[in-house]
UniProtKB/Swiss-Prot annotation:
InterPro entries, sorted: Sec_Metabolite_Reg, Transcription_factor_dom_fun, Zn2-C6_fun-type_DNA-bd_sf, Zn2Cys6_DnaBD
Ranges for region Disordered: 67-95, 218-237, 561-583, 692-716
Gene Ontology MF term list: DNA binding; DNA-binding transcription factor activity, RNA polymerase II-specific; zinc ion binding
Name the UniProt record assigns to this protein: C6 finger domain transcription factor nscR
GO CC annotations, alphabetized: nucleus
GO biological process: DNA-templated transcription
Feature: compositional bias, Low complexity: 561-570, 695-714
SMART domains (alphabetical): Fungal_trans, GAL4
Top-level taxon: Eukaryota
Purpose of the protein: Transcription factor that specifically regulates the neosartoricin biosynthesis gene cluster.
Keywords, ordered alphabetically: DNA-binding, Metal-binding, Nucleus, Transcription, Transcription regulation, Zinc
Organism from which the protein derives: Neosartorya fischeri (strain ATCC 1020 / DSM 3700 / CBS 544.65 / FGSC A1164 / JCM 1740 / NRRL 181 / WB 181) (Aspergillus fischerianus)
Record localization: Nucleus
Length: 799
């Protein structure tokens, strides 16, 4: 009898740890095991009875262990055979397994209850009330290893949820927070229940990502590395892919587990408002979504395309739209719409929710066009509000995913799919170029590839097509939903050729002129019938195109990366060249046009809705500072310096997107030298209230330069730097492309007269050969600046 009791209550064995089971390697079953120590990961030991095998294995259990009635003991009437003893021992082991499974289910229920309570009560719990689950979330390595041997109930953020957690758990001492251990513990709980072959679809609302995971391969069950995959499943990909990193290695997961779990944007009214903001302030610039489809989906509650209701790609896209909208808000807009400041966390919460949704979508392992659209919106929004290199780094992921989906290849598809694919690919190409400028680095998509894959979408409105359309639609004349987007698609192609040349041959210089002229012609052709006073969007499109034209011409003279000069034997016959003084004056004029337009979009009320996308053009600012410091004309310096000073202060305030020190430090030294050289020429203007030569105050204290940017449509179209970010203009929320004031009929613009002003071939500056490097001090100064930026970037990699 004593032996039978011992047989029924065996000691819980120490099985292979989680990582060894997943990797299918032998575990030495120490705590921690040698394999986990060598791999540098947290060892998660497994303590449970061994599963029955062979004829005694019970793979399918029709009832939950919590509802299996207890079996009455069978009286022993005579001698017990060996078969009966073996069956008795097997039933005892199964009973112990049932008890362990029941406890684990109870702990999972406590996890869900505590999280629901945390969503309802945002007040944080006192540190003394935090449950034992956070013991694995915190502490050092030794503490984590010891805690992993225990059970992991859920964290609680309020006293109200403590009642749902076992008493022995509440009494555990707390630890401080550590990023992702809690989710590791929760995954461990679910993984250890998997051997029971339970179907988690019944509780998909609580665990939408735990589905199609249950595969019993015998032995240490739950160690299967092969899981089911269904790209059209409304639920997320398998948990093993998310648990072992997913997008976390890209830095997308937040450090706060509550934020990564809590659906921040569950408020339908808030989501609706953010969608309206997106349609007004983001969609006119970033044309990767179909506006009518988004309106039907997020504003009217219809399904998105043919996706099921809970598809993770659709959830990721919804979160990305809300994040992009929140990032586009100014402080005044945020206060007026949500009655809270922008710094109160609306952008941060939206970003964390978007990151969590992207992680659940399994973008890296099962990419889709919808998921990639969400990722692109995330990168654009993050670049606008984050000065780190994250957006520049993650742009490479977007490029790879786009190529994996074949977005750069033409194929047989419907007209709607073709248009959306082309828009997405060209937007990613534009992001790649913008990221290269922010880091002063080479783009991932080179000029040859960008040219060979360049297929423009149609110049139409989104309302002209729908997902069921099969026939093509001709281009429209006049301002369309895609006008500014098409301008940026043209500039991303010209920008690569203008700034990342490979040779300084005469053929290269001639092609530089051709690229700049071709872009000007294409851009101006898109502006037929465009009245800049008809709407904020038209205002921005007009002035934005001016800025891009000036920026393209500036890049033809001062590319971001200068080509290496060729040997003397290949030099062409000498041709008339402008003097260095004339050259400097033209460079200064173009750079000032760029800066004035950028400053205008940061200050004019009509640009408020698109200001989030505008970054100060450091490339044009560096050229202007260099040329102004070498210019002997006092009147020209006095006219240019207020613009330079105001833009420099704005750059210091806003920062350079993606690279703060590597560009700003050399630029600051260049600015100091320019101030020292220009100050003797500006003694009379030093005390003028118009500007302050040595001011280092914020932008509000900086001078407001005289702007030529707000003039009539007959102005010269040469005022915006394509190397900077671009922006549209919606003046106020709630006015969707509405006229700002009374609009008079505008006749068709005289395109020939506008193009005549930009006839590059008629200008000796661009028609002639660029002056030799040794004869031009400004070029040497520019080369020194680019060398300093490259040196600063290299030093960032050193310890």
């Amino acid at each position: 009898m004593e032996k039978s009791n011992r047989r029924k209550r065996p000691s819980t064995p120490h099985l292979s740890c989680e990582l060894c089971r997943e990797r299918k390697i032998k575990c030495d079953k120490v705590d921690p095991c040698t394999n986990c120590v060598s791999a540098g990961v947290v060892c998660v030991p497994v303590h449970r009875p061994r599963l029955p095998r062979g004829v005694h294995a019970r793979r399918a259990r029709p009832m939950s262990p919590a509802f299996v009635p207890a079996r009455a003991p069978t009286p022993v009437a005579g001698p017990v055979s060996s078969e009966e003893k073996q069956a008795d021992a097997s039933s005892g082991a199964v009973g112990a397994v049932d008890d362990d499974l029941r406890k684990r289910i109870h702990r999972l229920e406590a996890v869900v209850n505590s999280m629901r309570a945390a969503m309802q009560d945002p007040s944080p719990a006192p540190v003394s009330q935090v449950s034992c689950a956070y013991r694995c979330i915190v502490g050092g390595a030794d503490e984590e290893q010891s805690v992993f041997n225990n059970s992991y109930p859920a964290p609680t953020s309020s006293l109200a949820c403590s009642s749902s957690i076992p008493i022995h758990v509440q009494e555990q001492p707390p630890f401080t927070s550590h990023p992702d251990c809690f989710w590791t513990s929760l995954v461990g709980e679910v993984g250890n229940v998997a051997w029971a072959n339970l179907d988690w679809r019944w509780d998909a609302n609580c665990f939408p990502w735990v589905v199609d995971q249950i595969e019993d391969h015998g032995g240490d069950v739950g160690s299967s590395s092969e899981t089911k995959s269904d790209t059209h499943s409304p639920l997320a990909p398998n948990m093993s892919k998310i648990g072992d990193g997913g997008l976390r290695f890209l830095g997308l997961s937040g450090n706060n587990p509550t934020l990564t779990w809590t659906p921040v944007l569950e408020d339908k009214e808030m989501t609706r408002q953010l969608c309206q903001i997106y349609l007004q302030q983001v969609d006119p610039i970033i044309k990767i979504l179909h506006r009518p489809t988004v309106e039907k989906w997020m504003l009217h509650g219809e399904r998105y395309l043919d996706y099921p209701e809970r598809h993770v790609a659709v959830d990721a896209l919804r979160s990305a739209i809300c994040y992009a909208a929140a990032a586009s808000l100014t402080d005044d807009q945020c206060s007026a719409i949500f009655q809270r400041s922008r710094s109160s966390g609306i952008v941060e919460d939206s970003r964390r929710a978007c990151e969590a949704a992207l992680e659940r979508s399994g973008l890296l392992v099962s990419p889709s066009i919808t998921g990639l659209q969400a990722f692109v919106l995330y990168l654009i929004a993050r670049r606008s509000e984050d000065r780190s290199q994250a957006a520049w780094t993650l742009t490479a992921v977007a490029v790879r995913l786009a190529k994996a989906l074949g977005l750069h290849r033409e194929r047989d598809e419907t007209f709607f799919s073709q248009q959306m694919r082309r828009r997405l690919w060209l937007t990613i190409s534009l992001m790649d170029l913008q990221a290269s400028f922010s880091q002063a680095s080479e783009p991932l998509i080179n000029t040859e590839e960008a040219t060979s894959t360049f297929c423009l979408p149609q110049h139409i409105n989104d309302s002209d097509m729908d997902p069921t359309m099969t026939h093509e639609i001709p281009d429209r004349e006049g301002l369309c939903d895609t006008t500014f987007a098409l301008v940026t698609y043209h500039i991303q192609l010209a920008g690569r050729a203008l700034n990342f040349g490979t040779a300084a041959s005469p053929q290269h210089k001639a092609s530089q002129q051709q690229h700049a002229q071709r872009f000007e012609q294409n851009a101006l052709r898109l502006l037929h019938f465009c009245d800049p006073e008809s709407s904020p969007y038209a205002w921005f499109t007009w002035h934005g195109t001016q800025c891009l034209v000036s920026g393209a011409r500036l890049s033809a003279l001062r590319p971001l990366q200068l080509p290496q000069p060729s040997n003397s034997s290949s030099q062409p016959p000498p041709s008339p060249s402008p003097s260095p003084q004339e050259h400097n004056h033209e460079l200064l004029r173009l750079a000032l046009n760029v800066l004035e337009k950028a400053h205008l979009m940061h200050t004019d009320p009509r640009g408020e809705g698109f200001r989030w996308y505008v970054t100060m053009p450091w490339h044009a600012l560096a050229v202007a500072i260099t040329e102004c410091s070498l210019c002997p004309d006092v009147a020209r310096i006095q006219s240019a310096w207020p613009t330079i000073e105001a833009c420099y202060q704005l750059l210091r305030l806003k920062g350079v997107a993606g690279q703060e020190e590597a560009i700003q430090r050399p630029l600051e030294r260049l600015m100091c030298r320019a101030r020292d050289k220009a100050s003797p020429l500006l003694q009379l203007a030093r005390h003028s209230p118009t500007f302050s030569l040595g001011s280092s105050a914020a932008t509000s204290a900086a001078p407001t330069p005289r702007s030529r940017a707000s003039s009539a449509p007959s102005d010269t179209l040469s005022d915006l730097s394509w190397p900077t970010a671009f922006s549209h203009a919606h003046s106020q929320l709630g006015v969707d492309l509405a006229p700002v004031g009374p609009v008079q009929p505008l006749a068709k613009l005289d395109l020939d007269s506008l193009l005549l002003q930009f006839d590059i071939e008629s200008q000796p500056l661009l028609a002639g050969q660029i002056h030799p490097v040794d004869a031009e001090p400004s070029l040497r100064t520019w080369e020194q600046l680019m060398s300093d930026i490259d040196h600063a970037e290299s030093n960032k990699l050193l310890p």
